[in-house]
Regions:
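Claisen-condensing/thiolase-fold acyl-transfer catalytic domains that form or cleave C-C bonds
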Residues: 97, 101, 108, 127-128, ...
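Short beta-strand segments
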Residues: 7, 124, 153, 178-184, ...
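Acyl-CoA/ACP chain-elongation machinery
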Residues: 182-183, 190, 232-239, 301-302
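Short acidic, glycine/serine/threonine-rich loops at helix termini
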Residues: 17-18, 132-135, 163-164, 189-195, ...
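Flexible, glycine-rich active-site loops centered on histidine and acidic residues
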Residues: 174-205
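Conserved small-residue
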Residues: 6-8, 58, 121, 162, ...
Length: 373
């Protein structure tokens, strides 16, 4: 069995950003038009009037102030309220592939690797652009990587599940190094007409190089000490979009074909599950929570992260102990915890212990214990 390290990370950030104020202006314009168009039905009590949103409400509910997006104009158009991403020919790289390439090239550079050093590609994300061929194989082709590639989906936990999958391949000698990528166009499955969730997501892509420790040469190395995964079925976060939708015409375009969640139930149920799993994971490795210098957590909701770390530490965490990026990136699903890792790792001294954890739909939770070399 080979010892395994993360030797490089990469980040692709879209050029466009939407502030809470911009998002609210679009949403409230839609609300005013809807209420005006349905005034008589609302007066008769047949339908409920929609309620306006506010930037203050969004920040208080989530900690989010802005988000990066692949398309801004389509989202902010009150007549559309969805990203506008023209279909590409089969001879062009797909949107997810384009994003993955941007993150992957940076990760390869930081790891000091070329395509010739990589034996496999894993694309792990919450929404795949198509059924087949695999996006990972397209990324493999775009970067000139030999070996194998495959896609996997564990929603917001896809990155930690992908890291374990990559680590297993390297540990067993099936690959020298694996490129694991998380391209997320979360705005594509978000209902921008839903007051409770229209602000939640942003777009981004991350990449991680997992390789044998004895061949790693970069200055960004972290030993993968241990990984631990957990899943438990729940309908509280769900998206029913799929290839069988066309077989049931009555459901096409329904609200459940986009992201839906029972937010309060998710908060109540997931926070203790995550804290318990991380705590048990550390204990299994004869490590104390007090030994952990940094927690890179899934970036979905600021209050969730505060509560999880408080359950673990028995006190409030500092900004250095549990870095936050969701204020400017929002929830980027599987990419979020890796963005926090990518942007907040260089200051840690050698020997520092850290935990990378993601959690979300499924329910699914992943924990990766890392030690900086």
């Amino acid at each position: 069995m080979h010892n395994v390290v993360i030797s490089g990370t990469g980040l692709y950030t879209p050029a466009n950003s939407i502030s809470n104020e911009e998002l609210v202006q679009s949403f409230n314009t839609y609300v005013a038009q809807f209420n005006a168009d349905n005034a008589e039905a609302i007066a008769r009590g047949e339908i409920e009037a929609l309620t306006e949103s506010s930037a203050a409400f969004i920040e208080k509910a989530s900690g989010i102030k802005s988000r990066f997006v692949m398309d801004k104009d389509g989202i902010l158009d009150p007549q559309r309220m969805a990203p506008r991403l023209p279909e590409r020919s089969n001879d062009e790289w797909s949107v997810l592939c384009q994003m993955a390439i941007g993150a992957a090239e940076q990760a390869l550079q930081r790891a000091g690797k070329t395509a010739a050093d990589i034996d496999g590609v894993i694309v792990a994300c919450s929404n795949l652009q198509r059924a087949y061929p695999a996006i990972a194989i397209e990324v493999q082709e775009a970067l000139g990587i030999q070996g194998f590639g495959f896609d996997m989906n564990v929603a917001c936990s896809s990155a930690t599940f992908g890291i374990q999958t990559a680590a297993n391949s390297v540990q067993l000698g099936q690959a020298r190094a694996i490129l694991m990528v998380n391209p997320e166009v979360c705005t594509g499955h978000l209902n921008f007409r839903d007051r409770d969730s229209h602000f939640i997501f942003g777009d981004a892509a991350t990449a991680v190089i997992v390789e044998r420790a004895d061949q790693a040469t970069s200055k960004y190395q972290f030993d993968i000490v241990s990984t631990k995964l957990l899943t438990k079925f729940s309908n509280n976060i769900r998206n029913n979009f799929g290839f069988l939708n066309r077989a049931a015409e009555e459901g096409i375009g329904a609200r459940d074909k986009l992201f839906v969640q029972e937010g309060r139930k998710v908060f109540k149920e997931v926070c203790p599950m995550v804290a318990e799993l991380i705590g048990a994971h550390l204990e299994e490795n004869q490590l104390n929570v007090s030994d952990v210098k940094r927690f890179w957590l899934h970036q979905a909701n600021l209050s969730m992260n505060h509560l999880i770390v408080k359950k673990l530490l028995g006190r409030d965490a500092t900004e250095q102990e549990a870095p936050v990026i969701l204020d400017t990136y929002a929830n980027t699903s599987s990419a979020g915890s890796v963005i926090a890792f990518h942007k907040n790792q260089d200051d840690l001294p050698a020997g520092s212990l850290a935990v990378l954890s993601s959690f979300g739909a499924g329910y699914s939770i992943g924990s990766v214990i890392l030690r900086k070399r």
